[in-house]
Each structure stands twice: as structure tokens, then as C-alpha cells.
Amino acid sequence: MRMQTKLIHGGISEDATTGAVSVPIYQTSTYRQDAIGCHKGYEYSRSGNPTRFALEELIADLEGGVKGFAFASGLAGIHAVFSLLQSGDHVLLGDDVYGGTFRLFNKVLVKNNLSCTIIDTSDLSQIKKAIKPNTKALYLETPSNPLLKITDLAQCAGVAKDHGLLTIVDNTFATPYYQNPLLLGADIVVHSGTKYLGGHSDVVAGLVTTNNEALAQEIAFFQNAIGGVLGPQDSWLLQRGIKTLALRMEAHQKNALCVAEFLEKHPKVEKVYYPGLPTHPQHELAKAQMRGFSGMLSFTLKNDSEATLFVESLKLFILGESLGGVESLVGIPALMTHACIPKVQREAAGIRDGLVRLSVGIEHEQDLLEDLEQAFAKIG
């Protein structure tokens, strides 16, 4: 089944009891049992809910996993995955990793005696050099947030397997429509379902899947034990969003390439980060590893001090957190999504105060270009 079809018919796409084409919202916290221990597959909605289960089956189907898991946020899912680790374990993280992931590790998981080394995961030699005897996991974002670095998943997964490490991939930017890390050797895939999968800025959710049965059993335990599960209403919204993912991603990518080409030629712009541009240093790798380049891009102005006025002058591009909705969003990562990362560390990774990140929506591309142009005019 091709991906466009699987997005609509994959997983559990209808209700077996009534034939309803849309999976019902099972708005219940508990379930009747015929006798002690005798139930119909569900006991309590933290442990399992039919609406959530349909979503979990869908993400597993889309990514090639054996089981999926839906959480109340992307970070809740990442927390559950990191709970697979033991006290004393060490993890490799990307130097421009999402700020929330960095904060989770640096402020919460360190209290469980977990440690990490921050490296450029797109550089295989840095990964090999950073592996320690107690290293247990390699955590990757590709494309990364916000510098859109591309990591060679097959090569990294091979190195990880040689050293007995788990390869965990945040596939939020690419989505299953453009990239399937499990098929390239990864062990676990995580998503912020809030972003492209939901696609309408109306739900906060996280998704996890794996193609390893033993890992699936462990993640299922932590999902239930920690309890950060997704409710039935949000599970239904996310399933509805996924049905149109193919159409939206094609539109996001078309507009993003148009915007990236416009910015690359603009005299006020110093550098554009978008893997769909032939000038991107890993453009060929992105073409080989992905089926498309998605709708995220970042760029730096020649004068960092003009970034705040520029983003505040935009009208169609909404100044705000998050990404992946049908509307275009703009932000300054150093002051917003990555503000929790120390300035020296941010700048060493290339996340300057003047770096602007765009989540390019599906509006008419000419309206977006005109909005950018009028904002450039405001900064003189």
C-alpha cells in the first residue's frame, strides 16, 4: 500500500462494531468487567483506550513498527523512551537538539544519574569519538531543529549497532510521509504529533513506535506507569489530521522551497538553511534518505540585531512557538524554542541570536513572499 493510501486506510481506520468510517471517540475512563479479570481488552483508559489504540496502530503502520504509543506531548513520549535507560548510562545528543529535549535531559534526567555528550551528530567521526563504555543510546534529529542538519541514518545506526547502542530518531520535521527511520536501521522513532501530523495547531500530542518487540513491551510499561497518555479527543483529532498529511506536506514543501530560493537571493540574508536547496551541504544525502524536504527552514540576517524587528514586522507569518500547522509561523530559536540552552553552547552550535526559523504554511506562496518583502523593507 502506498503512503498516500496508508495515511487514510492504515492502522484501524473504522469502527468494527458499527461500521463507522471514522473511529469513534470513546470518552470513558473505565470499562465494565464481566468478572474479576474478565474484560473485553480494556480496563482503564490510562492503560488503554480504543480511540488511542487506533492512533497507535496507525503510527506503527506508517513507520513500519510493531507497536505504537500515543502520549500527551512529544516530550512525554521522549521521557518514556529515555526511561529505558539505567542510572549511570550515557547518551549522545545533537548540538542543535530541540530545546525541550535538552531541558528534559539537562534538568530532569540528570537527577537519575544519566549523562549526555553534545556533538554534531551529522558528523559520523564525532559520534565514533564520543562513544564511551557506558554509552547506551544515540539520539538523532534529522532534519535537525533549527539548523536543518541531515544525519546519515543508515551509517549512524550501523555504528550504534556495532557498539550496542539504541538509535532513537525524532522524525517530527520529516514525518513518515518523507522519511522512515526504522527502515534505515533505527530502533525507536518519536514524533511531536502536535506539529505536521496534527497539522492544524489544535492538538498537543506525542507518538512513539519501534520495530523491536522487547522494546515495545518496555515502552508500554513506562507509558502506563508514568501515565502521560493521550486522551481520546486528542487521539481522534490527530487521526483526522494524519489523513490529509500527504496533501499538506506537498504544499508545505512547495512553498518552503519557494521561500528558501527567495531568501537565498535577498541582499539582507546571510545564509539559508534548507535541505531542499542544492547549496545545502547535505542536499544529496537528504535526496537519498528522504522522499522530500518538508516545510521547515531557518536563515540568518547579515545584521543579527535586526532579527527581532524583522519577525515582529511580519503579518502572515505568525510570531509564535511550535510548527507544522497549515498557517505559517516564525520564531527566533535563541529567544524562544532553544532559550533554555546556555548562550555559549547555542552559539557554538550555530544558533545565533539572529537566526530566524520559519514554519512555512500552505498559503499562496506569493502572499508569503510579499509578507517577507514588506518586513525586509521595515528593517531598511
Range-by-range predicted roles:
Residues 3-21, 305-345:
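C-terminal core of ALDH-fold dehydrogenases
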Residues 115, 129, 133-136, 248, ...:
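PLP-dependent enzyme catalytic core of the Aspartate aminotransferase-like
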Residues 25, 33-54, 58-61, 329-354:
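Glycine-rich phosphate/pyrophosphate-binding loop
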Residues 69-268, 273:
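Conserved PLP-enzyme active-site core in the AAT-like
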Residues 30-79, 83-84, 100-107:
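Conserved N-terminal alpha-helix of the aminotransferase class I/II PLP-enzyme fold
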Residues 257-321, 342-347, 380:
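Conserved small-domain helix->loop->beta segment predominantly found in fold-type I
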Residues 238-247, 294-302, 357-361:
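Short, well-ordered beta-strand elements within core beta-sheets of diverse protein domains
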Residues 1-42, 49:
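N-terminal glycine-rich, Lys/His-bearing helix-loop that initiates the first secondary-structure elements
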